[in-house]
Amino acid sequence: MNDNPANAEPQEEEVSLESQPSTPESGSDGSKEAELEAKIKELEDSYLRVHADFENTKKRLEREKFQALEYAYEKIAKDLLPIVDTLEIALKSANEVSGEESELQAKFKEGLELTLDNFSKVLQRHGIEMIACEGEFDPHLHECIMQVPSPSHQEGEIVQVFQKGYRYKERVLRPAMVSIAKSN
């Protein structure tokens, strides 16, 4: 539209400037590309860490769920142990009665024995077992409430059991209360 040659030259210069990429801009494109690649790498690394954390948490929760199910009887078993103790004490008292036993006393004692026997079988059926209290003292299974001199026992050996201990699978529900021999 403009036939003026003075106006035509600057337009050509502008076109020539636009068509030739400048060196600083191409360097910034390269640095932008490097920045973007670094950001992508950082985000990929972050994603992998979050994913690994998620997988670890998932595995931990599965393990805890399995343990909770596996040890579900533990709480009720702890609550039942005093009942077993009471039955054992009652049976011991019934056995210590001196004099002639009446038929009623004999039936009562027999009932206590059967109840205690059934209770013990139920506990065993559900994986609850009594802790053995013979021989050497084990601090993981026994609780020493006193040390006594005993010429018939070696030092550290269990002399007397005051309260039976129980365990459920690998966990100790209640340690056995014992006395152990001490050196003379």
UniProtKB/Swiss-Prot annotation:
| Family according to the record | Belongs to the GrpE family.
Q: Where in the cell is it found?
A: Cytoplasm
Q: Where is the composition biased (Polar residues)?
A: 17-29
**Function description:** Participates actively in the response to hyperosmotic and heat shock by preventing the aggregation of stress-denatured proteins, in association with DnaK and GrpE. It is the nucleotide exchange factor for DnaK and may function as a thermosensor. Unfolded proteins bind initially to DnaJ; upon interaction with the DnaJ-bound protein, DnaK hydrolyzes its bound ATP, resulting in the formation of a stable complex. GrpE releases ADP from DnaK; ATP binding to DnaK triggers the release of the substrate protein, thus completing the reaction cycle.
- Gene3D superfamilies attached to this UniProt entry: 3.90.20.20, Head domain of nucleotide exchange factor GrpE
GO biological processes: protein folding
The UniProt entry, under InterPro entries, shows: GrpE, GrpE_coiled_coil, GrpE_head
Name of the featured protein? Protein GrpE
> Sorted alphabetically, which keywords does the UniProt record give?
Chaperone, Cytoplasm, Stress response
* PANTHER family cross-referenced by the UniProt entry: GRPE PROTEIN (PTHR21237), GRPE PROTEIN HOMOLOG, MITOCHONDRIAL (PTHR21237:SF23)
GO cellular component terms listed in the entry, alphabetical order: cytosol
This protein's major location comes to cytoplasm
Q: How does it assemble?
A: Homodimer.
HAMAP family to which the protein is assigned, alphabetical: GrpE
Kindly list the organism's lineage.
Bacteria, Pseudomonadati, Campylobacterota, Epsilonproteobacteria, Campylobacterales
Which GO terms of the molecular function aspect are on file?
Answer: adenyl-nucleotide exchange factor activity; protein homodimerization activity; protein-folding chaperone binding; unfolded protein binding
Region (Disordered) location: 1-35
